[in-house]
Regions:
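Short secondary-structure boundary/hinge segments and terminal tails
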Residues: 43, 113, 118, 135, ...
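Acetyl-CoA-dependent GNAT
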Residues: 4-93, 97, 110-112, 116, ...
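Residues forming the Rossmann-fold NAD(P)(H) cofactor-binding site
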Residues: 103, 107, 111
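Active-site acidic-Proline motif in GNAT/NAT acetyltransferases
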Residues: 97-99, 103
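Conserved GNAT acetyl-CoA-binding A-motif
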Residues: 110, 117-130
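C-terminal "cap" of GNAT-fold acetyltransferases
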Residues: 2, 11, 89, 123, ...
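Short polybasic/polar patches that bind polyanions
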Residues: 101, 118, 140
Length: 173
């Protein structure tokens, strides 16, 4: 496994792989702001619209996890835009392709992301995830603090359930 940072140009070259990870995760029920149907084209459009410009502008950083050269995981660090919060960032879109599960990719991505945040002068990180999910258990095992759960926060990908979202914070030392 290799964790690496992609800039906007590298991310654009890897767009099909990044979009495939997101599509596979959404199809598998991951609540990452999308509902079914969710196509490869939908995923690529989101990456082009939301991520690539933010990478170019320095508002976001992107990590990927490769296994035998194949990108199987990704996570993003979005810097707080508020002038009074230069110490804060949000962790977004921790995604691991089903083919990469149970290999420690999520943990490795989060560990590297925290190192990257520290090096960028960020000391307070926030994130949210589906209540009761494997991601929630991962964040708890990494020492993140549960702020609370907002009930009925977001629809499931199949639009049948309004599920709770667990909000976490982590003060980096």
């Amino acid at each position: 496994m290799r964790i690496e940072e992609l800039d906007a140009e590298a991310a654009e070259r890897e767009l099909p792989a990044l979009a495939a990870i997101m599509r596979a995760c959404v199809e598998g029920g991951a609540s990452v702001n999308f509902v079914l149907p969710f196509t490869q084209a939908d995923s690529e459009a989101w990456w082009r619209r939301a991520v690539l410009p933010a990478l170019r502008d320095g508002e976001r950083r992107l990590l990927v996890a490769r296994v035998e050269g194949r990108i199987l995981g990704t996570v993003q660090l979005a810097f707080a835009p508020q002038p009074n919060q230069p110490h804060r960032a949000e962790v977004t879109k921790l995604l691991v392709h089903p083919d990469g599960r149970r290999l420690g990719l999520g943990r490795a991505l989060m560990t590297r992301l925290e190192e990257m945040a520290r090096a960028s002068g960020r000391r307070l990180l926030i994130l949210d995830t589906v209540e009761g999910s494997a991601a929630q258990r991962l964040y708890e095992s990494l020492g993140w603090t549960l702020l609370g759960v907002v009930p009925r926060f977001a629809l499931s990908t199949d639009r049948t359930v309004l599920g709770g979202s667990a909000f976490f914070w982590n003060e980096l030392r």
